[in-house]
Amino acid sequence: MLRIGYGFDVHQFGGCRPLTIGGVSIPCMKGIKAHSDGDVMMHSLIDALLGAACCGDIGSMFPDTDAKYNNIDSRKLLRIAWEKITMQGFLLENIDITVILQIPKINTYIYQMKHHLSQDLNCSVTSINIKATTTDTLGYIGRSEGIACIAVVLLTR
């Protein structure tokens, strides 16, 4: 059985948290506003995985009203969600992620992001695709007010 999941997340710049994408700390003049570490890649991926497995969403599993998730490393959340999904017999086929941001450029960090995901999900880096794009200065992302991420996953059981 094939199961497809889709996840989306967005965070606003302007907070005091460092910019973390895919578990990688990226130098940026702007911080992120968030309850956890604000990692849009991890959050959209968790939502995609949970969706494919019909296990709800990140907000239900890790509510931002719970103080224990304040400042938490989103890689930890990913590992918890993935354990729940694999306990149901799901296997990961592939991941496709698009990070949408005007600044900063992240191409030099993509290999490290893929490595983190492959470690956390116990899969090959060849099952993970990560790319970045801009909005050509349009909208809140184009004005460098925030970043977004879309993740699509394919699971089998």
Curated annotation (Swiss-Prot):
Protein name: 2-C-methyl-D-erythritol 2,4-cyclodiphosphate synthase
GO BP of this protein: isopentenyl diphosphate biosynthetic process, methylerythritol 4-phosphate pathway; terpenoid biosynthetic process
Pathway(s) annotated for this protein in UniProt: Isoprenoid biosynthesis; isopentenyl diphosphate biosynthesis via DXP pathway; isopentenyl diphosphate from 1-deoxy-D-xylulose 5-phosphate: step 4/6
Cofactor(s) listed: a divalent metal cation
Record's signal peptide: none
Residues binding a divalent metal cation, per UniProt: 9, 11, 43
Note on how the cofactor is bound: Binds 1 divalent metal cation per subunit.
Enzyme class: lyase
Organism of origin: Blochmanniella pennsylvanica (strain BPEN)
Gene Ontology molecular function terms on file: 2-C-methyl-D-erythritol 2,4-cyclodiphosphate synthase activity; metal ion binding
UniProt cross-references to InterPro entries, sorted A to Z: MECDP_synthase, MECDP_synthase_sf
Keywords: Isoprene biosynthesis, Lyase, Metal-binding
Family: Belongs to the IspF family.
Disulphide-bridged cysteine pairs: none
Lineage, opening ranks: Bacteria, Pseudomonadati, Pseudomonadota, Gammaproteobacteria, Enterobacterales
Task performed by this protein: Involved in the biosynthesis of isopentenyl diphosphate (IPP) and dimethylallyl diphosphate (DMAPP), two major building blocks of isoprenoid compounds. Catalyzes the conversion of 4-diphosphocytidyl-2-C-methyl-D-erythritol 2-phosphate (CDP-ME2P) to 2-C-methyl-D-erythritol 2,4-cyclodiphosphate (ME-CPP) with a corresponding release of cytidine 5-monophosphate (CMP).
Pfam families (alphabetical): YgbB
Residue(s) at site: Transition state stabilizer: 35, 134
Keyword S-adenosyl-L-methionine: no
Highest taxon of source: Bacteria
